[in-house]
């Protein structure tokens, strides 16, 4: 499956906000002009963006935040639309309960890309079973842990230390000494951090 491997800062500048693709705890705001589009001089056109363009940009932004490609994103939206409740909130819950995102939220990876790599390299277990599919859906009560062979990796230790300092989301409980965490429940919309307007995505797919 193809994935973007170019400069991460360029993606954040394209969306005009820090997508935290380089580090979960360190903002890009001090390193580059997020309000300036990528390119030698940035985008200078003052043309107003259409409603469709705004909706499309929001979808692209969310795809980049979670590292999901178009076909997969469409499947998530279709599933979110089938479920009871608010479609936009359902969509974010599906994305947040991906295994790679849960590993990231528990602080085992400093970015979602790093967390995805840990899963792909079989460094993660779910309920004691090795898991290597980043898109695996984690359920309430599932225990996600770092395998013994990976516990001494410096990047994991450092990421976990930074996450402890910054605080964990309320919907996960992490035992840093054991390198494991429990997915307590699906996050409520208010618990999901980030500059995301999911209603724009719902409007886009409702056209």
Curated annotation (Swiss-Prot):
GO terms for molecular function: rRNA binding; structural constituent of ribosome. Pfam families: Ribosomal_S4 (PF00163), S4 (PF01479). Keywords: Ribonucleoprotein, Ribosomal protein, RNA-binding, rRNA-binding. Residues 31-55 are annotated as: Disordered. InterPro entries: Ribosomal_uS4 (IPR022801), Ribosomal_uS4_bac-type (IPR005709), Ribosomal_uS4_CS (IPR018079), Ribosomal_uS4_N (IPR001912), S4_RNA-bd (IPR002942), S4_RNA-bd_sf (IPR036986). GO terms for cellular component: small ribosomal subunit. CDD domains: S4 (cd00165). One of its GO terms (biological process) is translation. Residues 97-160 form the S4 RNA-binding domain. SUPFAM superfamilies: Alpha-L RNA-binding motif. Residues 42-53 have a biased composition (Polar residues). HAMAP family: Ribosomal_uS4_B. Belongs to the universal ribosomal protein uS4 family. Part of the 30S ribosomal subunit. Contacts protein S5. The interaction surface between S4 and S5 is involved in control of translational fidelity. One of the primary rRNA binding proteins, it binds directly to 16S rRNA where it nucleates assembly of the body of the 30S subunit. With S5 and S12 plays an important role in translational accuracy. This is Small ribosomal subunit protein uS4. It comes from Burkholderia ambifaria (strain ATCC BAA-244 / DSM 16087 / CCUG 44356 / LMG 19182 / AMMD) (Burkholderia cepacia (strain AMMD)). The lineage of its organism: Bacteria, Pseudomonadati, Pseudomonadota, Betaproteobacteria, Burkholderiales. The gene is rpsD.
